[in-house]
């Protein structure tokens, strides 16, 4: 039986005649909110907000309760009915290919990030958070805006809306006022309209979205991270490979902070071969892997993602990982980790199309680079990793 995941607006779960299919084998669908409906909701909010009771004072305590419910509770998620924590993880696997160990890890990261962040001063803004589909850890921004704003509109990814819907249900169950949160699944063109309709906006997306969305006041755009790692001359090959492996493979390569580019001051091939051998040990058929991989649920998506690497390779570049680019096991489709050693173009040339290329699986390109070339690429990266130090944020994503 096909189910419809509802929107949440005007204080209640709401179906829609405008729907889109959810990825996965269940055949479920997602209710979409047209821009004209969102515009009417903004007008309603402007008239309603002055007369609402104040938002809860102890927001941090409420958010921590909501995270407990998000992770473990049985919640009424609109259109899907009561959903336990275990059923949520099963649904993530079936629809988005997110394995249980990653879901557990990401839930823990949400709590850690919330507890570490200073409590903001609340204001009267209507905030928008437009989420990506690669990881639900970006729900930390929803929590941040709930703690800060008068109300929050959440626009989930159509590829993975389940986590956003469950967080809205958890907020409601923890006592957050229903008029102060909304879930607006929309078609992509409606995003611009949602930005116009709200006061503060946090938008996640890749390079195409970053180019398409204008930058009005109040917009924070989280685009490509272009994360890179700089390996100094003299660092032992085995030590460098051990250091780099988790930077590339953790979280199935889905974070904007996962390293995609490795620039080494020493010979590149020994390091690239050692790293490729380590990546080849990541087997999607192994359920207890240290580095679990996500499965691809959209037909052809894994092939498109891996092809985007092959199409950017230049003469002289070599793919050193040996597994097939895409494997199917138990009916599940995976993109296997990729490691490319760039050829004899200018060392570490920042214009090489593979340097900084982001895909939703573990991938990195290794190049030898002079110090000036490495620093030139690092200046274009949001995350720069050096041995024995934390990631450095090199530029403001705004």
Regions found by a protein language model. Give the residues of each.
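N-terminal Rossmann-like NAD(P)+-binding subdomain of aldehyde/semialdehyde dehydrogenases
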Residues: 1-122
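Conserved C-terminal structural/oligomerization subdomain of aldehyde/semialdehyde dehydrogenase
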Residues: 21-38, 42, 47, 54-68, ...
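Short glycine-enriched loop/turn motifs at secondary-structure junctions
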Residues: 25-29, 194-196, 223-225, 255-258, ...
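A short, well-structured beta->alpha microelement
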Residues: 107-108, 112, 180, 369-373
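Rossmann-like NAD(P) dinucleotide-binding subdomain of oxidoreductase/dehydrogenase enzymes
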Residues: 112-249
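Short, charged/polar "capping" segments at the starts of alpha-helices
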Residues: 162-163, 210-211, 269-271, 390-396
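ALDH superfamily catalytic-core signature
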Residues: 173-177, 199-200, 209-348
């Amino acid at each position: 039986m096909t189910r419809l995941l509802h929107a949440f607006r005007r204080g209640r779960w709401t179906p829609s005649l405008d729907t889109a299919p959810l990825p996965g084998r269940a055949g479920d669908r997602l209710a979409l909110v047209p821009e004209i409906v969102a515009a009417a909701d903004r007008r309603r909010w402007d008239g309603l907000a002055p007369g609402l009771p104040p938002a809860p004072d102890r927001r941090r305590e409420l958010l921590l309760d909501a995270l407990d419910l998000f992770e473990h509770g049985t919640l009424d998620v609109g259109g899907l009915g009561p959903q336990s924590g275990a059923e949520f993880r099963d649904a993530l696997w079936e629809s988005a290919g997110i394995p249980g160990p990653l879901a557990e890890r990401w839930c823990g990261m949400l709590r850690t990030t919330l507890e570490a962040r200073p409590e903001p001063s609340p204001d009267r803004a209507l905030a928008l958070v437009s989420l990506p589909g690669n990881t639900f850890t970006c729900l930390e921004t929803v929590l941040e805006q709930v703690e800060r704003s008068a109300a929050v509109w959440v626009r989930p990814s159509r590829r993975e809306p389940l986590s956003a819907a469950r967080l809205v249900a958890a907020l409601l169950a923890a006592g957050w006022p229903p008029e102060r949160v909304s879930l607006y699944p929309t078609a992509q063109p409606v995003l611009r309209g949602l930005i116009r309709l709200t006061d503060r906006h946090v938008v996640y997306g890749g390079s195409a979205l970053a180019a398409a969305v204008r930058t009005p006041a109040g917009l924070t755009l989280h685009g490509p991270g272009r994360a890179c790692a700089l390996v100094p001359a003299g660092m032992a090959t085995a030590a460098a490979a051990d250091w780099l492996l988790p930077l590339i493979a953790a979280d199935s390569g889905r974070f904007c902070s996962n390293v995609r580019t490795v620039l080494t001051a020493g010979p590149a091939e020994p390091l690239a071969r050692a790293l490729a051998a380590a990546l080849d040990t990541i087997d999607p058929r192994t359920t207890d892997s240290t580095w679990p991989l996500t499965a691809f649920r959209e037909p052809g998506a894994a092939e498109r993602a891996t092809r985007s690497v092959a199409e950017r390779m230049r003469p002289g570049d070599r793919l050193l990982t040996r597994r097939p680019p895409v494997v199917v096991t138990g009916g599940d489709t995976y993109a296997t980790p990729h490691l490319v050693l760039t050829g004899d173009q200018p060392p570490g040339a920042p214009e090489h199309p593979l340097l900084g290329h982001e895909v939703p699986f573990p991938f990195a390109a290794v190049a030898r680079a002079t110090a000036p070339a490495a620093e030139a690429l690092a200046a274009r990266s949001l995350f720069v990793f050096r041995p024995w130090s934390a990631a450095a944020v090199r530029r403001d994503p705004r």
